[in-house]
């Protein structure tokens, strides 16, 4: 199997007067599984289509395996794309759907049979080869679409929201199958999604995009644990990170975040790293906020969401702000209860009025 790096060097794209990608640079290493994650309209699918050759590049260069390809047609780039819609030929068997692209480029019958046999084994669809798409479930059709890419032996796989049409249970199963497929093939893979769970569980690195630019590139736990911006902190994680307006008190060189009611959250963020002036917000994830009798932060429970192994508590603080705390196991807390909260300040982040994040030293 071919495995190639992909390099984007100051790539730009315009639709009329609207710039949708602006001088974006990124290196995807050979064998990496990269997720492009972001909301609708952020440019992630456009960027994928530029790599595939389905959209032109208005500036910069794209290189695959060290070779510049942005001037080449899609078929000459050595990539295989799997779309949200399966795009299978309904009148053909699964075998013929898998073979179609290979026949068009003159691949021998023996080689076609060998590749299809191998792809069918990996994807566990050998028993489906004589069926037509109408006889398959949604998950089976998606595996056939992936198989059609697999038999091409490409330099890289490009997935454009391939799980969006599947129901929740099937989406989980197919996600596991994709992870297993990458472990077996170690193929360079780009996966476009708006679903943070797909990105977090599948990718070795995530490219978080917003408003046609890259907000952050990092491993899933870097993105989750040390978000570069407020957008990333809000977009990744469920429930979203809590944000509360604060003033800062110096605590031996570290920042204590003072809330509106005078209570404090002692962070490990260095005071000298913070900007002078401007508004600041403390950001804390729900799992770092606990109901405890000795907690420093008082509040009233408004909504209780019981999720089985954990409970999310929506709490209004005495200064009027709200947050979500997580209670492990079967919580005894009820709506209307007054509680006290303890916050793990070591995991807290601070954000300035431009949305930039400040973290504890590593």
In which residue ranges do the predicted regions lie?
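ABC ATPase nucleotide-binding domain
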Residues: 7, 27, 63, 340-342
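Conserved ABC transporter NBD signature motif
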Residues: 60-68
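Pre-Walker A (P-loop) beta-loop-beta motif of ABC nucleotide-binding domains
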Residues: 24-35
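ABC ATPase nucleotide-binding domains
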Residues: 33, 74-231
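Helix-to-loop junction immediately C-terminal to a conserved catalytic motif
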Residues: 52
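Non-catalytic connector elements of ABC transporters
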Residues: 239-244, 250-362
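The feature captures the beta-strand-to-loop junction immediately N-terminal to the Walker
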Residues: 37-39
